[in-house]
Amino acid sequence: MRILVGVLCAVTLAAAMPRQTLTAATSCDKLASLALPNVTITLARDVAPGAFMPTADPGADDPPPNPRAFAGLPAFCRVAATLKPSSDSDIKMELWMPAANWNGKYEAVGNGAFSGAIGLAAMAGPLARGYATSSTDTGHAGNTGRFALGHPEKLVDFGWRAVHEMTVTSKAIIAAYYEAGPRLSYWSGCSAGGRQALMEAQRFPADYDGIIAGSPGLDWTGRAAQAVRGAQLLKDESARLSPAKAQALHKAAVDACDATDGLKDGLIADPTKCKFEPGTLQCKGADDSSCLTAAQVETARALYSPLANPKTKRETAGLQPGSELGWTSLGWTASARATGLDQFRYLVFRDASWDIDRFNSQTDLARADEADEGIVNAMNANLKPFLDRGGRLIQYHGWSDPQISPGNSVQYYEQVNKLLTGVKVSDSYRLFMAPGMGHCRGGEGPNVFDPIAALEQWVEQKNAPEQIVASHMTNGAVDRTRPLCPYPQVATYNGTGSINEAANFSCKRP
């Protein structure tokens, strides 16, 4: 009981802690006896410097993380726990805490897709920077939606509860280990982790002081419907685009839209400012790899187009011109298609035999939205509680993302601004769109940048990010840098100097 009281006091007093590095106040193994509500600590062990070697998660579909991700880690206390906020919950989590030189801060990391594994590799970075860090499997093993069939509480865990419970538990264990809770807490995630980021800001505004929401799957049901619709349309092989035809379509899109920002640089600064018509590529004679058949033109139009919920009239965005190099033979990425199928099979119709052939584009997005009830979709635009308590949110998205439409990020940012009239949203929440960047990373445009450094400056030094410089690399060498700008600003060439150097661009409204 003494430890539990100490935990509560330390969390309460965390904000008053001086900004200095701290060393553990108790031994790691003693945390095994820590009593917390609905929590069973299954491991509390010291890890020597450079000694951690991951193994495959028993329930995960992914291979074990690359050991190189853990090279050079400092000594840390490794804690594993199982959380049971409901009778059907089985949430696994890990928390890593530096044995010495803790920076007094906590950074949790997000997941991907259906998230059935703890993100050990993602935890390595924060730990190396002096953070206490944690991750969760969101309450199930494996990266499919099968876990939700017949288990409504597990769906709630996946949708939002597991991350919040992990956060509360992590802060309590941190307080017990250092006799001081974290003075600042951060969240960082991309894709499903970006969805988790926005869900935390919406539901639990006090959990985190700063949040990174990368390429967020906030419109979970809409993305699922779009991906399934695309796969259904493309079951007709004559409508599919070969890699060569996708390349030709991509070139046509870039040729048509590249100069909308006044600069021909091989990147589309904002695809929404260009009305690209794939019909311009329709074959005028014999079919070959440089043109599209009439059926393939319709495929492209469908993949670019939004899909509407006929009951609420809301639209979920399609893919954007410039994303074609990431398309598969069935349109959206294989991951998007798999999670889309599982969404309808296990979460909407709750029928393991349901197949893509049964998808109805006129009615099934509405059914998916109704079944979700805000459990997984993170589209609540009321961020006022998070902003009012001083929270800071950086959201980013690649314009060439072939897995989660960047249009959904723009829609959400605009909805927040529309709802919070009288609030200068950009003082606390900024969206950065990355021309030519794919899903979370990669692509023809600059796609390597450090959003957490920008967030730390914003939260801790009150320096709002006016731009974030991103790099493009080829064979490990930087060959282009460009500022990412707070939406709706775009990087605008100053007129002189190399177009491959960020210093020659300014962020301006178009």
Report residues per predicted region.
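Histidine-bearing beta->alpha loop at or near hydrolase active sites
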Residues: 428-442, 474-475
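Cap/lid segment of the alpha/beta-hydrolase catalytic domain
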Residues: 65, 103, 112-182, 225-226, ...
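Glycine-rich nucleophile elbow surrounding the catalytic serine of serine-hydrolase chemistry
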Residues: 189-199
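Catalytic-loop region of hydrolases
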Residues: 17-104, 121, 250, 263-268, ...
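A catalytic-pocket lid/entrance helix-loop region that shapes and gates access to the active site
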Residues: 199-201, 206-308, 433
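Short beta-strand/loop motif that positions the catalytic acidic residue
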Residues: 394-397
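Alpha/beta-hydrolase fold nucleophile elbow
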Residues: 180-191
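Short, solvent-exposed loop/turn and secondary-structure capping segments
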Residues: 90-93, 118-123, 138, 144-149, ...
